[in-house]
UniProtKB/Swiss-Prot annotation:
GO terms for biological process: mRNA splicing, via spliceosome. Its main location: nucleus. It comes from the Eukaryota. Keywords: mRNA processing, mRNA splicing, Nucleus, Spliceosome. Pfam families: Beta-prop_RSE1_1st, Beta-prop_RSE1_2nd, CPSF_A. GO terms for molecular function: U2 snRNA binding. It comes from Aspergillus fumigatus (strain ATCC MYA-4609 / CBS 101355 / FGSC A1100 / Af293). GO terms for cellular component: nucleus; spliceosomal complex; U2 snRNP. This is Pre-mRNA-splicing factor rse1. Involved in pre-mRNA splicing and cell cycle control.
């Protein structure tokens, strides 16, 4: 397969995966505070929990460009800092540390032990670390185990030994943990099955008799050798191990979790067993056994406990009682094992208990949760079951025990962290008529599923909204003295006057402030140590601390049209075009500079920068004129008001703002001039602090209204508030320091300013029509806003109404009782027992029952009602599997909703009692559905599509065309076009692209005259297709179950032959090639994403931009592929990729090129995620790479962040947000 391509795409992640595969806890910063490290796909993220506010904030995130299989934290004895061990697919063990001063991960050790990739005999699947940090064991699923001794050298640096082998061939490992043995030789416990005899026995008897063993491996530190110390049979269904505290804290050993029971085991102790309690209720099956799927052990002073979770989400508190000696001291001998119901939380992939009294739940599906412990469940009335009442003998079954689930009593939910995992389907539509479309998704599972609206923006918290007596034109806040912490006044300017409000416990009008109330205000500033100034059209009022006022009147027949101020300088522009400059003297008076500067046109705006630390003045004044220019004037005493530079603009400037902001290119701060134009365009340009030259201009269109700019403070950093038809915030990314421009999720404002009070330390005050609004921005780390609407069951497909802003979602849950069955069981229970407790399914899930399906169709209104407005339940154990909106020509092109269902479907191995195609008519503008009829088919119709006024259905391997009849669908044409199962359909004209579950895509042409379907081209590679979209008439983009994205194109000759007029006889009789179609598709691009693509869209994310491909992944990933338009850009990014891969290789040791070529060589794709790692590099590395590429650092960063414009097309991504956060939509 050729790896070069004549087509290149730039692959970029808009939102990284939100599914957390593992989370660990530790003091990674070396302080007493605990941090959480999570693995999401290839992303490693460290989070800071805030116990005072009950919030979790991500600090730093890095793509390791590899599959993170397992994580573990460890601490060397005597140290205060935890290190992180990563088990990945690189065939290497990686030890990293978090460096808080640089806010980055630093790799300490990288030791190779085997082949790369996820293989059953290459260690990396299991990782266990001795609690004292002396050794770690990394193991594979089968055979291989390696022990590394961890120590420190004379320089107190972490060292790692050569690996010690503990291999055992033909042995499968199910779980592994380290024992807590204090400072004795480290011991590791594993659940193993030896399959050597079963492998040689064709009768299967050896397999039936095979035992699962709990095995101890001891590392002898003296002999530097690993021995298999102890092995004992355990329950064959055992699947998890949990470490029991040892030494002075407990008896050591492990908890072995199996189906329906938990057993305490240790080599020198008796076994103790308790059953896992089962739910009791009208809809619960009392015979269903539970298993433990997650858990956590927490040590407190003098005590410890476990929280173990079943597949229902129920948490059980498990404790161990120990025997006491005559003095009442614990002996370390176990007396009993106890278990009781604690609370119910979402099913977790990881559970973490923080020392500050919080529980972190990394959910398997849906949002992650952060709980606070209200109590530990010691004094409640829950029944406690202990091992004294149950036999420890494995051959004797435990009697089942039951508990009654209830609402949360011990845990209080304090924060929910958004997660799109699993993301099933999406649509990209601009329903709000914003400047960018919204992404609508269906995600989650069971009763915790949701329909979500994603849009680009920052979340705003409104504090106050107050109506004013008339419409103000501007608002300011000011302190009374420089030393004040909070603002004292809000000044409102009206067309005929000025209103001053004092800020205190209440906001009220004040009149004795010295401000002129009979004229509108142009600027307000706290000047010097303790004075104020007010600029109005007729002059400048300098209000001293004792309320004395010095007035500077404007010259006769002239007025002030613009003003700029800082704490020491004032500049005003007169209607005659003159600039008058004032500077504060040593005695605190405002002195006018002798000369005035005459500008060539009318001045529209001015700006003075802040006075730098240790300086007495800002060096430059920016002047915007109506001749569409911006001039930089010097304010130095030697060259006051001299012209330093000029920049021509496309429109007259409406606002200017000089401010110093963080700069990713230099690592420090840089002076920028922000420019707003009357045309709605915003520009940001670098202002040289020495020469005053303007360079490196970036542009963005913000809206139809003139842009106004205001300097504000958000989360401790200086930012620019840009107001046009909607508000925007320009700020520095927390991680990369790159400039980001993001819209605010707020009403359009006419004016804005900083606001600081005791109640709102960092806020903003704004004007919207006749309203005064005070608001704040809480988070800068997430700029994708989500609105969520709960759904009933796991969504399978979504569809937008052809005309109305409504969505239709088909949902189905396997092994779940249908609503009708649940209602019947509850009624029966009420008749027998009276009142029945029905638990909310969003917290407790639906009752399970093997072989049952719960399925429905829901209509969602995301704009007006923002809720599900109608639900149609499917009966007779049918499960909805596909959906399409089809206009039928035979019904005057009326559009019907067509839903495909499967009856009595079994997922694995796949089987069903056939399928049905339901027809629904849209009523009430799509808000209701009227059932027409349903047609039985032999297999579930997994793909449906409207095609030339009829219905195209993929049923098994058969492609079929139906028309609408009175009582059922009428079969018009069919052909077997694929070898296995049709899972997707796309069409343009008479061409149909058919996706097969495991044989990629096949192009089929429909010949109308002869009413036949003819496959004429297919793929040379078997791809397990999950989603496809037609990019053009000959090209298809697709994704597969192994995480690949690809683009295939039909050969031009085959395409032309298929479109020739006539019967297509030559296509029918053309000889097939290798049991397939006569022709093969050409592969254009191919890359590996590490997430399963669930939907693909050809769309525009910027109004007027060129088409790009947007894809969504199962784990919540949203990414895009942007086509390159120039070979020069391709060459630049290919060279940058190579430099980055060699200068900063991936953290976990995986080779980047091999990673992106996991199943097939990467072709025609530039990895934008790797390119954006450039932002995170130290400055010296940036400069070294820039020198290799013969470019400047700023030029490279500009290339990465500002995608190319070509022949007048709109910039695809302007000031793109680094992928470490999220891309601008």
């Amino acid at each position: 397969m050729a790896t070069t391509s004549n087509m290149f795409m730039y692959s970029l992640t808009i939102q990284p995966p939100t599914a957390i595969t593992q989370a660990i806890l530790g003091q990674f910063a070396g302080t007493k505070e605990q941090q959480i490290v999570t693995a999401s796909g290839s992303k490693l993220t460290i989070h800071r929990p805030d116990p005072t506010q009950g919030k979790i904030t991500p600090i730093y995130s890095q793509d390791v460009f590899g599959i993170i299989r397992t994580l573990a934290a460890f601490r060397l004895a005597g140290s205060s800092k935890d290190y992180i061990i990563i088990g990945s697919d690189s065939g290497r063990i990686t030890i990293i540390e978090y460096v808080p001063s640089q806010n980055r991960f630093n790799r300490i050790h990288l030791e190779t032990f085997g082949k790369s990739g996820v293989r059953r005999v290459v260690p990396g699947q299991y990782l266990a670390v001795d609690p004292k940090g002396r050794a770690c064991l990394i193991a594979s699923v089968e055979k291989n185990k390696l022990v590394y001794v961890l120590n420190r050298n004379s320089q107190a640096e972490l060292t790692i030994s050569s690996p010690l082998e503990a291999h055992k061939p033909q042995t499968v490992v199910f779980a592994m943990t380290a024992l807590d043995v204090g400072y004795e030789n480290p011991i590791f416990a594993a659940l193993e099955v030896d399959y050597s005899e079963a492998d040689q026995d064709p009768t299967g008897r050896a397999y039936e008799e095979s035992e699962k063993l709990l095995v101890y491996y001891e590392l002898d530190l003296g002999l530097n050798h690993v021995v298999r110390k102890w092995a004992d049979p355990v329950d064959r269904t055992a699947s998890m191990l949990f470490q029991v505290p040892g030494g002075a804290d407990g008896p050591s050993g492990v908890l072995v979790c199996a189906e329906d029971n938990i057993t305490y085991r240790h080599s020198n102790q008796d076994a103790f067993r308790v059953p896992i309690p089962r739910r009791i209720g009208a809809t619960e099956n009392p015979e269903r056994k539970r298993s433990i799927v997650a858990g956590v052990m927490h040590k407190m002073r003098g005590a410890f406990f476990f929280l173990l979770q079943t597949e229902d989400g129920d948490l059980f508190k498990v404790t161990i009682d120990m025997v006491e000696d005559d003095n009442g001291q614990l002996t370390g001998e176990v007396k009993r094992l106890k278990i009781k119901y604690f609370d119910t939380v979402p099913i977790a992939s990881s559970l973490l208990i923080l020392k500050s009294g919080f529980l972190y739940v990394a959910s398997e599906a849906g949002n992650h949760h952060f709980y606070q412990f209200e109590k530990l469940g010691d004094d409640d009335e829950e029944t406690e079951f202990n091992s004294e009442n149950f036999p420890a003998d494995l051959s004797v079954p435990c009697e089942p025990v039951f508990f009654q689930p209830r609402g949360a009593e011990n845990l209080n939910l304090v924060e929910t962290l958004n997660s799109l995992n699993p993301l099933i389907d999406s649509k990209i539509v601009n329903l709000n008529e914003d400047d960018a479309p919204q992404i609508y998704t269906v995600s989650g599972s069971g009763a915790r599923s949701s329909f979500r609206t994603l849009k680009h923006g920052l979340e705003v918290s409104e504090i106050v909204e107050s109506e004013l007596p008339s419409v103000p034109s501007a608002v300011w806040t000011t302190k009374l003295t420089r030393a004040d912490e909070f603002d004292a006044y809000i000044i409102l300017s009206f067309a005929n006057g000025t209103l001053v409000l004092s800020i205190g416990e209440t906001v009220e009008e004040v009149t004795d402030t010295g401000f002129l109330s009979t004229a509108p205000t142009l600027a307000v500033q706290q000047l010097g140590e303790d004075s104020l100034i007010q600029v109005h059209p007729r002059g400048i009022r300098h209000i001293l601390a004792d309320r004395r006022v010095n007035e500077w009147p404007a010259p006769q027949h002239r007025s002030i049209v613009a003003a700029a101020t800082n704490e020491r300088q004032v500049a005003v522009a007169l209607s005659s075009g003159e600039i008058v400059y004032f500077e504060m003297d040593a005695d605190g008076t405002l002195a006018e500079y002798d000369e005035r500067r005459q500008m060539s046109g009318t001045v529209t705006c001015l700006s003075l920068g802040e006075v730098p630390e240790g300086r007495v003045r800002s060096s430059f004044l920016a002047v915007g004129c109506d001749d569409s220019t911006v001039r930089i004037l010097s304010l130095d005493p030697d060259s006051t008001l001299e012209n330093k530079s000029v920049q021509a603009l496309t429109s007259a400037p409406s606002a200017l703002n000089i401010m110093s902001m963080a700069d990713s290119s230099s690592g420090g701060t840089t002076l920028y001039l922000h420019i707003g134009l009357y045309s709605g365009v915003y520009l940001r340009t670098v202002l040289d602090e020495v020469t005053g030259e303007l360079s490196d201009t970036r542009t963005r269109f913000l809206g139809a209204k003139p842009v106004k700019l205001f300097r504000v403070s958000v989360k401790g950093q200086t930012a620019v508030l840009a107001l046009s038809s909607r508000p925007w915030l320009g700020y520095s990314d927390i991680q990369t320091k790159g400039f980001m421009l993001t819209p605010l999720d707020y009403v359009g404002l006419e004016w804005g300013w900083n606001f600081s009070s005791e109640q709102c330390v960092e806020g903003m005050v704004g004007i919207q029509a006749q309203n005064l609004r005070i608001f704040s921005i809480e988070k800068l780390d997430n700029n994708i806003l989500q609105e969520s609407i709960p759904l009933s069951n796991t969504p399978r497909r979504m569809l937008k109404h052809p005309e109305q802003p409504l969505f239709y979602v088909i949902e189905s849950d396997n092994n779940v009782l249908s609503p009708a069955t649940r209602a019947r069981l509850i009624e029966d229970s009420k008749a027998r027992n009276g009142e029945t407790n029905v638990l909310p399914p969003e917290d407790f899930g639906y009752p399970r029952a093997t072989g049952h399906w719960a399925s429905c169709i829901q209509i969602v209104d995301p704009l007006d009602a923002k809720a599900v407005i109608s639900t149609i339940e499917l009966e007779e154990n049918e499960a909805a599997v596909s959906m399409a909106a089809v206009p039928f020509s035979s019904q005057d092109d009326e559009t019907f909703l067509v839903v495909g269902t499967a009856k009595d479907m079994i997922v694995n191995p796949p089987s069903s009692a056939g399928g049905f195609i339901h027809i629904y008519r849209f009523q009430e503008d799509g808000k209701e559905l009227e059932f027409i009829h349903k047609t039985k088919v032999e297999e579930p119709p997994l793909a449906l599509l409207g095609f030339q006024g009829r219905l195209l259905a993929g049923i098994g391997s058969t492609l079929r065309i139906y028309d609408l009849g009175m009582k059922q669908l009428l079969r018009k044409c069919q052909a077997q076009v694929v070898s296995k199962t049709i899972v997707g359909l796309q069409t343009q004209g008479s061409r149909i692209v058919v996706s097969d579950v495991r044989e990629s895509v096949t192009y089929v042409v429909y010949k109308y005259q002869d009413n036949i379907l003819i496959p004429f081209v297919d793929d040379s590679v078997s791809r397990w297709t999950t989603s496809t979209t037609m990019v053009d008439y000959e090209t298809v983009a697709g994704g597969d179950k192994f995480g690949n994205l690809w683009l295939v194109r039909c050969p031009k000759k085959a395409s032309e032959e298929a479109d020739e007029d006539g019967s297509g006889a030559h296509l029918i009789h053309e000889r097939g090639y290798l049991h397939g179609a006569p022709n093969r598709l050409d592969l254009m691009i191919h890359t590996y994403t590490q997430d399963i693509p669930t939907s693909l869209h050809k769309t525009q994310l910027v109004a007027g931009g060129r088409d790009i491909l947007v894809w969504t992944g199962f784990q919540g990933t949203i990414g895009m592929l942007v086509p390159f338009v120039s070979r020069e850009d391709v060459d630049f990014f290919q060279n940058l990729e190579m430099q980055l891969a060699s200068q900063c290789p991936p953290l976990a040791g995986r080779d980047h090129l091999i990673y992106r070529s996991y199943y097939a060589p990467v072709k025609g794709v530039i990895d934008g995620d790797l390119c954006e790692m450039y932002f995170l590099l130290p400055n010296d590395t940036k400069m070294m790479i820039a020198a290799e590429l013969d470019r400047s650092v700023r030029e490279i960063e500009r290339k990465i962040s500002v995608r190319y414009a070509n022949e007048g097309s709109v910039l695809i991504i302007l000031m793109a947000i680094p992928a470490s956060v999220c891309k601008g939509l």
